[in-house]
Amino acid sequence: MDQEIEIPSFFLCPISLDIMKDPVIVSTGITYDRESIEKWLFSGKKNSCPVTKQVITETDLTPNHTLRRLIQSWCTLNASYGIERIPTPKPPICKSEIEKLIKESSSSHLNQVKCLKRLRQIVSENTTNKRCLEAAEVPEFLANIVSNSVDTYNSPSSSLSSSNLNDMCQSNMLENRFDSSRSLMDEALSVLYHLDTSETALKSLLNNKKGTNLVKTLTKIMQRGIYESRAYAALLLKKLLEVADPMQIILLERELFGEVIQILHDQISHKATRSAMQILVITCPWGRNRHKAVEGGTISMIIELLMDDTFSSERRNSEMAMVVLDMLCQCAEGRAEFLNHGAAIAVVSKKILRVSQITSERAVRVLLSVGRFCATPSLLQEMLQLGVVAKLCLVLQVSCGNKTKEKAKELLKLHARVWRESPCVPRNLYDSYPA
């Protein structure tokens, strides 16, 4: 764009400072670009006007057609300067159109497929459409499709071989039915994820009055779905658990933890791996879930991930992994599994002072847990030889947080009789060993 062209200030969105493509008016009377104000209100979860700081009482956005036409005319007049005319935006979907679409979908499988494809298109257009879909109870509609489809291909008849059926025709029909159900499930799951459902709607899905247990359904998908659907299932499960009540989290079934660990093992996608770790962070503060997670092989999996440079190179991954290890090592089964892994002590010790303050604090807590409750002569010698004791002494010398220093000092004092006079502690660190 030529620098000599001056853009009228009222053409610019107060948030993005770019020319508005779809100007809309909020309840305070200020005009913004639709995409920017939707992101501010819905993704940012703010309820105030960025310009006036007044509370936005109504989230309905009124299109400013006059300003939009004025911007389009200005763009046309200045086309010779390389300014492109902004297209006329599509109007947001209305609730009646959504309800009609859902009603028509119940008439046949083909209409259901068409409905899901249309919903995907609607979701991709703008955030207002997403809120309209939510108001029309589309999340519940999609969850029911997913649940019913999963029940179909998980039904007992799905395990029958063709020899158990009356003839080959029946076998082919059954196979087609399962393929159709899986295809519907994959499409509905994708739309449900991209809908970016609000916290209120997520809670409604968790407490579905129609009896659909979405958590169980997503667990089954993580077990048997295609890679993309397994990833979406993990992402949705994380969102659901973030708004779940403590009792709902405590009552989670053992199978869920096994599938979460499998997601971590398969490394389906960066987002799926991150969500699986977040699920463990959300669920493992409760004792029952710690036992389930340990039985599912969580500790071994996390140690292996921490040894993987691709995973551990991201600070947040290392932090979450160490938080989960800390929680699991607070139970006896967790400490036993931790010590059963030959590289556990070395891997955890290596993360101290190398990633972040959170990682260092949690790593020291893990070492304190095993050092306090599982201190055998061989373990204490291993910690000496691996440089754990020297690392703990170093923690006392550097700036790394008072909590971390307190835990390190506690562990060093606990085994001072064995460690204090050891030649494995470098002389430059010896003076920091607590008395």
From Swiss-Prot:
Gene3D superfamilies: Leucine-rich Repeat Variant, Zinc/RING finger domain, C3HC4 (zinc finger)
Keyword list, A-Z: Cytoplasm, Plant defense, Transferase, Ubl conjugation, Ubl conjugation pathway
UniProt PTM comment: Auto-ubiquitinated leading to degradation via the 26S proteasome. This Auto-ubiquitination is repressed by the bacterial elicitor flg22 thus leading to a transiently increased protein stabilization and accumulation.
Deletion consequences: Increased tolerance to drought stress.
Pfam families: U-box
Domain called U-box: residue spans: 6-81
Pathway given in the UniProt record: Protein modification; protein ubiquitination
PROSITE patterns in alphabetical order: U_BOX
Protein name according to UniProt: E3 ubiquitin-protein ligase PUB22
Organism name: Arabidopsis thaliana
